[in-house]
Amino acid sequence: LVSSEMCIRDSNYIMKNFNLWLGIGGSLLITLPVQAQKKTKEKQPNVIFIIADDLGYGDMSCYGAHRIQTPHVDALANSGIRFTDAHAVASTSTPSRYSLFTGHYAWRRNDTGVARGDAGMVIRTEQTTIADMFKSAGYTTGAIGKWHLGLGDKTGTQNWNKKVSPGPEDLGFDYSCLMAATGDRVPCVWMENQQVLDYDPSAPIEVSYTQPFPGEPTGKNNPELLTNLKPSPNHGHNQAIVNGISRIGYMKGGGKALWKDENIADTIIAKSVGFIERNSDKPFFLYVGTNDVHV
């Protein structure tokens, strides 16, 4: 997912227009062009921001890794800037994304820890986000992949069978196609523009992080149904079963909308490419949260 005009091409351009923070090991931070409000004749660069959880400094071959080769990341490093002194603002999903989008330290608030799958949206709608700032500079904005910042007003009150608000559109994103939380947490459906993608009305969705649903199998009680991964009780991965894998949290319904774990990466790529192609004639900012690599 590389734009021909990515802003990391020229170090002089970056030093003039950007303050850049980059954290390796699960979180990256970037601020906007400080000259975003100025109208210039120069075409604005497209910005694609890719974040990977649990990706260590030594996991990519451009940093010296030998067991696994990462040629596409290496190509980005060779044509841009490879940082050798960088620090993560947080080592887990929710706080790193909170800081990425807001520019605020997550530890300044006590509700930015690793969020449940039914968490209310952690970022407040009155906060200014990186997407807001790009929009003010004339960009079309998108968020695709792992979200893990909550949706809706309050934890545990979402109606997953309707549009869930507030959400990314209230934080400056024109388009979104997201995993509400993580691959191992329910709900195991894609949320496109805050509505379940491929919603199946014959299988209404219910989610709970406190009580199992009567009659619904769990990894703890029905290990014989686990065809892909065995439960891990120490981490709570013994609750709802989706696609032969027991998850954190309880869920019923979903039907045709339930994702297939083996297709998650392909879905993220397809949705990202679609966004890029639809907006190829105008400047865009795209956040891409990968699911692969995440433990």
Where are these regions (language model features)?
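Short, small-residue-biased leader/transition segments that mark boundaries at the very start
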Residues: 1-8
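Short, low-complexity, intrinsically disordered N-terminal modules
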Residues: 11, 32-33
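Formylglycine-dependent sulfatase
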Residues: 16-19, 24-28, 34-295
